[in-house]
Every structure is written in structure tokens, then in C-alpha cells.
Amino acid sequence: MFLFLSALFYLALFFVHTHFLLTYSPLVFLGLVYLLPVLFNAGVLGLQRSKNWSFLSFVQLPTFASMSYVAFAYQADATGLWEQFISLYSITDGDMTVEIAPSLLDMGQLVFMMLVYYGGALAQYGWETYKERSKKKEVTYA
């Protein structure tokens, strides 16, 4: 059930990104594209957690997030939305220059996205297993 709802969330997120990209500021873009999926995954994994959760649960959600990101990046590149976003927010002012990556599908962007999504899930998995081990150590037998 959680996986189905998560897939719907990422599908909706894809459509929101493709329709509202040009209304995002760069800070909002970073929050919605990189931070929101990590927080969403953490929330779902926290709700889903039961006695039989496994490492697989911590891989599936970042995979959905990654697929949504790649689909959005492809759509933004193919339609020219990303070029419009770049032209809106690339700034050159004297000594300072703010540049945005020419494509969301650049290798550096994809590696960063994977590190953020899977790194967040791996950190949560480590934290959850640490808590489980701590609970087992606290059990006293009479």
C-alpha cells in the first residue's frame, strides 16, 4: 500500500515540477527536487516500519524518487523548460557569476541526486538498525 501511494506521490511530483518549474526560485527548486523526496521517504519509512522491514524497503523509495527525477529532467530538457529556467536565474554581476548546470541529466547532477536520495535512505537504515540493536541490548531477563 505504501509503495503504491509513494509511486502516486512521485508521479504527482513529476507533473507539478513540469508545470510549475518556471515559477520556482532556485532555492525552492532545490528544496522541492532534492530535499522533499528525502523527507517524504523518511516519513513513509517511519510509518511503514514494522518488525519485518528490510533493506529492500530502503531501496525502493529512493528508486521511485530517482525515476521521477530522471523523467522530470528529460521532460524539462526536451521541452526547453530547463533552458528557460537557466536564463531566468543565471546571473553575471561584475566579479560574481551564478551559473546553473546546462542539463539536469549531466553526470554530475545524476551522481549528486543519487547520493542525496540513496544516502538519505542509507543513513535512515543505519539509524533504524542502531535503534533496534539498542532496544535488544536494553532487554533484561528476570
Predicted regions and their residues:
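Alpha-helical membrane-inserting segments
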Residues: 12-17, 40, 44, 48, ...
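Interfacial non-cytosolic loop connecting adjacent transmembrane helices
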Residues: 19-29, 68-109
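Transmembrane alpha-helical segments of multi-pass membrane proteins
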Residues: 1-9, 55-74
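N-terminal signal-anchor transmembrane alpha-helix
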Residues: 1-38
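Alpha-helical membrane-associated segments of multi-pass integral membrane proteins
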Residues: 6, 86-134
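Canonical alpha-helical transmembrane segments
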Residues: 32-60
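Membrane-interfacial segments
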Residues: 20, 24, 52, 127-136
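Short, charged juxtamembrane terminal tails flanking transmembrane helices
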Residues: 1, 131-142
